[in-house]
UniProtKB/Swiss-Prot annotation:
<feature type="binding site" description="in other chain">
    <location>
        <position position="238"/>
    </location>
    <ligand>
        <name>IMP</name>
    </ligand>
</feature>
<feature type="binding site" description="in other chain">
    <location>
        <position position="302"/>
    </location>
    <ligand>
        <name>IMP</name>
    </ligand>
</feature>
<comment type="similarity">
    <text>Belongs to the adenylosuccinate synthetase family.</text>
</comment>
<keyword id="KW-0342">GTP-binding</keyword>
<dbReference type="InterPro" id="IPR027417">
    <property type="entry name" value="P-loop_NTPase"/>
</dbReference>
<feature type="binding site" description="in other chain">
    <location>
        <begin position="13"/>
        <end position="16"/>
    </location>
    <ligand>
        <name>IMP</name>
    </ligand>
</feature>
<keyword id="KW-0658">Purine biosynthesis</keyword>
<keyword id="KW-0547">Nucleotide-binding</keyword>
<comment type="pathway">
    <text>Purine metabolism; AMP biosynthesis via de novo pathway; AMP from IMP: step 1/2.</text>
</comment>
<keyword id="KW-0460">Magnesium</keyword>
<keyword id="KW-0436">Ligase</keyword>
<dbReference type="GO" id="GO:0004019">
    <property type="term" value="F:adenylosuccinate synthase activity"/>
</dbReference>
<keyword id="KW-0963">Cytoplasm</keyword>
<dbReference type="Pfam" id="PF00709">
    <property type="entry name" value="Adenylsucc_synt"/>
</dbReference>
<feature type="binding site" description="in other chain">
    <location>
        <position position="128"/>
    </location>
    <ligand>
        <name>IMP</name>
    </ligand>
</feature>
<feature type="binding site">
    <location>
        <position position="142"/>
    </location>
    <ligand>
        <name>IMP</name>
    </ligand>
</feature>
<feature type="binding site" description="in other chain">
    <location>
        <begin position="38"/>
        <end position="41"/>
    </location>
    <ligand>
        <name>IMP</name>
    </ligand>
</feature>
């Protein structure tokens, strides 16, 4: 059975957790292929809200095996805190597994993340301060510590010493901080070994064997397309590749085994942190979307920047990820707005751009060119088919589908799992 990948099509917080949760009851494995506890997502099940950070949303699907993939960076302390929090609420976390090849976030990564952001001042990226970027830097620099290293104290010590040799110089001489003691870091990691050991697997082997046996594997991408270190609005991006190609690398599932690439996209647009955002609203409408949509970060509580739907971004995201389907979320948030603008192109220094500008400078100068659609006042949270939607809401959805260039197979009309219009089956269609 081929694999399915879910990818955020904007700047994150699109509702990937809801999409994963909706499909979770029909899949056998849910793997998180990238990111760490910097990418929070909210899942509502039976009126209960769960805010997940490091764990895949599939942890709440009783039939699925949730896996933290090799492309992730894992803060072990945060991992077990999140597990304990779910268990305290009666959730079953016993099926959770972690790739032996996933990298670890060390306490010094978090220190470096925070002091670097402060040092940069106005040039700061706006990270969550959780050490994700520094952990990925170590991975690429071949100084990283992996999950499997926790079970070999000799290897662990060698790697910690190698990593701290340079970092202590930076902390002491540049940031005026105290040096980090090797023994403290080694003991920190070893303290998790006993509890971690039964969770660790060869995830590449497990997932590909599952596919060989006809099982359904869902890859749940973190962050989003325009936070991708290669395809995003660089340098205001994350440190990994949260696109469909990155899901393949971060799970060990080859690209030819992926049958569906599903983009998750809001009916409007949000962004957290610094970086360009052509359709951003700076008036009371932006505040309205923020409050009505509950647009506050799961991890940081920071208010999200809000703006109108951007079809240029949607087309580019579809191209980069090879989307077969879009899952649109939060259509209900737009209820009550008299006229809804949609960005269909950009004006860059007097020149119309129907597609994403090539350069960073051009994108910073991009101004949205809008088309306007009549809104609706009717409550749509009970709609379960397109025909149930008011005419104006239906027209809005169909217009977005045409402008975005990829079929809309599901539409979220509320936060709960069942508040979804399914147009096309996302697994078998």
């Amino acid at each position: 059975m081929p694999a399915i990948v879910i990818v955020g099509a904007q700047w994150g917080d699109e509702g990937k957790g809801k999409a994963t949760d909706l499909l979770g009851g029909r899949v056998d494995y849910v793997v998180k292929p990238n990111g760490g506890n910097n990418a929070g997502h909210t899942v509502v099940v039976g009126g209960e809200k769960y805010e997940l950070k490091l764990l895949p949303a599939g942890i709440l699907s009783p039939n699925a095996v949730p896996i933290i993939g090799n492309g992730c960076v894992v803060n072990l302390e945060a991992l077990f805190q999140e597990i304990d929090g779910l268990q305290a609420r009666g959730a079953d976390t016993s099926k959770l597994r972690v790739s032996a090849n996933a990298h670890l976030v060390a306490p010094y990564h978090q220190v470096l993340d925070k002091v670097t952001e402060r040092f940069l001042g106005k040039r700061a990226i706006g990270t969550t301060g959780r050490g994700i970027g520094p952990a990925y830097m170590d991975k690429v620099a071949r100084l990283g510590i992996r999950v499997q290293d926790v079970f070999d104290e000799s290897i662990l010590r060698q790697k910690v010493e190698g990593s701290l040799h340079q970092k202590n110089e930076v902390l002491v001489k540049i940031y005026n901080r105290r040096s980090v003691v090797v023994d403290e870091i080694v003991e920190y990691f070893l303290s998790f070994a006993e509890r971690l050991r039964p969770l660790v697997i060869d995830s590449t082997l497990v997932l590909n064997t599952a596919l060989d046996e006809g099982k359904v594997v869902l890859m749940e991408g973190g962050q989003a397309t325009f936070l991708d270190v290669d395809h995003g609005t660089y340098p205001f991006v994350t440190s990994s590749n949260p696109t469909a190609g990155g899901a393949s690398v971060g799970s060990g599932i080859g690209p030819t085994r992926i049958s569906r690439s599903i983009g998750i996209i809001k009916a409007y647009t949000t962004r957290v942190g610094a970086g360009p955002f052509p359709t951003e609203l700076f008036d009371e409408m932006g505040v309205y979307l923020q409050k009505t949509g509950g647009e506050f970060g799961v991890n940081t509580g920071r208010p999200r920047r809000c703006g109108w739907y951007d079809a240029v971004l949607a087309r580019h995201a579809s191209r980069v990820n090879g989307f077969t389907d879009y899952f649109v979320t939060k259509l209900d948030v737009l209820t009550g707005i008299e006229q809804i603008p949609v960005c269909v192109a950009y004006d860059v220094d007097g020149v119309r751009h129907d597609e994403m500008p090539m350069t960073q400078t051009e994108f910073h100068h991009a101004k949205p060119i809008f088309e306007y659609f009549d809104g609706w006042t009717e409550d749509i949270t009970g709609a379960r088919t397109l025909a149930d939607l008011p005419e104006n809401a239906r027209n809005y959805v169909l217009a977005l589908e045409k402008l975005s260039g990829t079929r809309f197979s599901a539409i979220g009309v509320g936060p709960d799992r069942d508040q979804t219009i399914v147009v096309n089956d996302l697994i078998n269609d």
